[in-house]
Structure formats: C-alpha cells, structure tokens
Amino acid sequence: MILTVQNLSVTYGTKKAIDNISFSIEPGEVIGLLGANGAGKSSAIMAVLGIEKSNYEELTMLGKSPILDRKEVFQEVGVQFQETNFQDKLTILEACEQWESLYKQTADVPLLLQTFGLVGKETQLVKSLSGGERQRLSVLLALISNPKLVFLDELTTGLDTKARRMLWKQLLAMKEKGLAIVLTSHYMDEVEALCNKILILKEGKTVFHGTIQEAIHASEKATLEDAYLHYAGEEDWI
C-alpha cells in the first residue's frame, strides 16, 4: 500500500473533529475525500500529513511513518493546498527552482511547464497570473518531486471547464503510470472522472467508503451527486 490510515481520530478540546476513519490506497489509485464544509476533510488531511496531532492505530506512507520518518517520506510525497501563497516578486521559474531545491530528485520541469500550459510564462511574476494559472502552478509544484503520492485540495476550484478537463487528462495519464492521489473536491463530475473510490465524511465520521457505483447502489439514488447529498446530509437544503 502507498498509504494506510487505520482508526484515525482528531480531537479539539472535547470535540472530535475526526472519529476513527480508515482508508488505504495502492499505486495508481485515486481516493476522493468528500463532505460538506466543516465535515472534517481538512482536519483529516492535516492529520494524515502529520500537521495536526492525532490518534491512530496505523498511519503509514510508502511503508514509513509520516511523523517519525518525515524528511524521508516527503521526498516522495507531494502536497497542493487550496490556497498556495507565493512571494510577490517570485517568477514562475524562480518558484520552480525554490521547490526543486527541497528535493534530492525532481521531475522534468520543462516538461511539467509544457504539460500544465505554462511554457512561455516562465519569467512572469506569479502575482500577475490568472487564478487558473496560479492553480495549475500549485499542482505543478506538488508534482515537482516526481512523487509516488500526492494530496490535492479542491483541485480545480476557480478553473473554467476547458482548464479543468485539461488538468484531469494530465492527472489520469500520471495515474496510469502509478501515481496515487488523495483528492478533495466539491465537483462530482471531477470525482467520477478521477476517483477509484470515495470516502464521505459527516461530522467527522465515515458515512460511506467504497466505489462510486457502490455509493449510487447503496443509496438507491440515480447519480453520484444525489448519492453524495444523501450521505452528506445535504438533501434537506435542496
């Protein structure tokens, strides 16, 4: 397994933000971590990354502890957050060079720039980029270490339909080569395009874990979106 999470919990004071969640992924798999705002998605990812304090039965990445073997593990794990902050006077190329300096081995940066449609923009200041370009850059940087596992938080927020589909195509090609992905998203078409399985959280607890077809079948709904709304407890808002 690339990632194994067994009975992980996060507590803030007396409140359990995450309550005994478990999941695992193998090379070439994508799991979608879904839930309404406040369901615990961010807390879960932060705990798995070792940023948030947590209790767990097992937590391993690439067969090692992301907490005890942190430096070694994160040479092969990429992370993209929804809000990536860049220095105001940094160019795209300088941002890539900064990220490259953190790793012993890196991917082919010119190829990544081409893949993500940023060729010819290398000398542009990051602050001058459009929202979609900044999002593509943040995903590129998460992949610069040529990782075996990457965490993508709200992957295509702010992107138009064409840019979203372009990014899906690129990630599917990387998935075929063995890249494992943990993805959070509010877009069910994105989840259907990318994910092998999903885990839906409600108030920090797992309310569904399985494949998309299993979610649709078990909920007795016609679509993934309807199944998601059912499990996440958002049907009452419609």
Show which residues each predicted segment covers.
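Catalytic Walker B motif of ABC-type/P-loop ATPase nucleotide-binding domains
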Residues: 150-153
